[in-house]
Amino acid sequence: MKTKAGFVALIGKPNAGKSTLLNTLLNAHLALVSHKANATRKLMKCIVPFKDKEGYESQIIFLDTPGLHHQEKLLNQCMLSQALKAMGDAELCVFLASVHDDLKGYEEFLNLCQKPHILALSKIDTATHKQVLQKLQEYQQYASQFLSLIPLSAKKSQNLNALLECISEHLSPSAWLFEKDLMSDEKMRDIYKEIIRESLFCFLSDEIPYESDVIIDKFIEEECIDKVYAHIIVEKESQKKIVIGKNGVNIKRIGTNARLKMQEVGEKKVFLNLQVIAQKSWSKEEKSLQKLGYIYQRNRD
């Protein structure tokens, strides 16, 4: 069997549709999806098998990254550093740009990325044919920069094979790097954590999802059931009250939604215990971010 394998960084502005694209390619719910920008905070490896037209069985390891953005908040700097690290580690990049975005995000990416890349135009199902053609024409001024320009829709599964074919074409022959049926090298407890975070984005509004995170205190994995004990961390006591809700209605909704998704992903029953704590300025403190597993490289210049 002829095989290829390689790491591909998936880069884009917040809400470009990176996580939706990966979940569609995997046919599974692993990456956090929200209509709110900047939902993804940590790099995740997602492994997509693909047989290309040359007969190679390719193992494409996508590095799902936080959206490219610049803010002074320490947490946001951590997120940006992960996207930059992914670009450095990958042999190929895919820049995902919404058909509704201007070209500024792509121009910023060009200044940051030194690797060969494919430009993918996402969400074409939400635009008219004329709008898609116009946006493709706008990007043609950078034709010498990208390997290929591919319009696609993850929601409608349009042109996804074309994207995978193009990626496989630019990977080198190699033995597979992971087991055949593995979709991610993430531990189940980390996937469960992201599912809880996604539920926060689903049921909470305004700034609360951005000023919250999840810590798995205890994870017990048994044959027929996973037991998850976690707490949601917020910045203020007032936010804690909102997360819990009157008579606990909000935390029950969040917990039920998360538990059902966990059971779908884990293919077994899940017991979920959620608590809420308030810790002032956790997203601005390096010690707190280290505890939560975010990578941060301080600029010492």
UniProtKB/Swiss-Prot annotation:
NCBIfam families: era, PRK00089.1, small_GTP. Residues 152-154 are annotated as: G5. An essential GTPase that binds both GDP and GTP, with rapid nucleotide exchange. Plays a role in 16S rRNA processing and 30S ribosomal subunit biogenesis and possibly also in cell cycle regulation and energy metabolism. Gene3D superfamilies: 3.30.300.20, P-loop containing nucleotide triphosphate hydrolases. Belongs to the TRAFAC class TrmE-Era-EngA-EngB-Septin-like GTPase superfamily. Era GTPase family. It comes from Helicobacter acinonychis (strain Sheeba). Residues 64-67 are annotated as: G3. Keywords: Cell inner membrane, Cell membrane, Cytoplasm, GTP-binding, Membrane, Nucleotide-binding, Ribosome biogenesis, RNA-binding, rRNA-binding. Residues 122-125 are annotated as: G4. Transmembrane segments: none annotated. This is GTPase Era. GO terms for cellular component: cytosol; plasma membrane. One of its GO terms (molecular function) is small ribosomal subunit rRNA binding. GO terms for biological process: ribosomal small subunit assembly. It is found in: Cytoplasm; Cell inner membrane. GTP binds at residues 12-19, 64-68, 122-125. InterPro entries: G_ERA_dom, GTP-bd, GTPase_Era-like, KH_dom-like_a/b, KH_dom_type_2, KH_sf_prok-type, P-loop_NTPase, Small_GTP-bd. Residues 38-42 are annotated as: G2. The lineage of its organism: Bacteria, Pseudomonadati, Campylobacterota, Epsilonproteobacteria, Campylobacterales. Residues 204-280 form the KH type-2 domain. Residues 4-173 form the Era-type G domain. The gene is era.
